[in-house]
Every structure is written in C-alpha cells, then in structure tokens.
C-alpha cells in the first residue's frame, strides 16, 4: 500500500489503552483504535485523553489508525 492511499482525519483522544494504544473519537462521530507512529514514540511526545490528534486510516480497515500528530 502506498502512503498516498491513507485517509487523514482529526479527532480527540477519549481513552488511553495498554501498549501505546488509544481510543480516538473522530470529527464525524466514529470511534477508532489508534496506535502511535514511530516519530511520536521516538521523540517521547505524551498523548493524554482530551488531546486533539491527526489520525491516518487505511482504506482497508477504517476501525484502526495511526496517530501522526498531536496538536498543541
């Protein structure tokens, strides 16, 4: 899958789960399970419930995603 095929949406973290997983509510009302991208993990950026984030979704599985950016 090419990187161009991802769907980028914004959402809010509602719950922190084990193993750096998060439950994120998207702007359209859907809830997805998201993990942290490598760059965020590498730079020790903390993500807490209530944070606004950008999530990349694969067109093949819209229930899982990757958090690529945390807004300040």
Curated annotation (Swiss-Prot):
Q: What's a single GO MF annotation on this record?
A: translation initiation factor activity
Question: What CDD domains does UniProt report for this protein, alphabetically?
Answer: S1_IF1 (cd04451)
Highest rank taxon of the organism: Bacteria
The record ties this protein, via InterPro entries, to: NA-bd_OB-fold, RNA-binding_domain_S1_IF1, S1_domain, TIF_IF1
Entry GO CC: cytosol
Domain S1-like, chain residue ranges per copy: 1-72
Where is the PTM Phosphotyrosine found along the chain?
60
Gene3D superfamilies the UniProt entry points to: Nucleic acid-binding proteins
Pfam families linked: eIF-1a
Q: Which UniProt keywords apply?
A: Cytoplasm, Initiation factor, Phosphoprotein, Protein biosynthesis, RNA-binding, rRNA-binding
Subcellular location per the Swiss-Prot or TrEMBL entry: Cytoplasm
The UniProt subunit note reads as follows:
Component of the 30S ribosomal translation pre-initiation complex which assembles on the 30S ribosome in the order IF-2 and IF-3, IF-1 and N-formylmethionyl-tRNA(fMet); mRNA recruitment can occur at any time during PIC assembly.
User: What is known about what this protein does?
Assistant: One of the essential components for the initiation of protein synthesis. Stabilizes the binding of IF-2 and IF-3 on the 30S subunit to which N-formylmethionyl-tRNA(fMet) subsequently binds. Helps modulate mRNA selection, yielding the 30S pre-initiation complex (PIC). Upon addition of the 50S ribosomal subunit IF-1, IF-2 and IF-3 are released leaving the mature 70S translation initiation complex.
Q: Which family does it belong to?
A: Belongs to the IF-1 family.
* Name recorded for this polypeptide: Translation initiation factor IF-1
Q: Which organism is it from?
A: Geobacillus kaustophilus (strain HTA426)
Lineage of source species = Bacteria, Bacillati, Bacillota, Bacilli, Bacillales
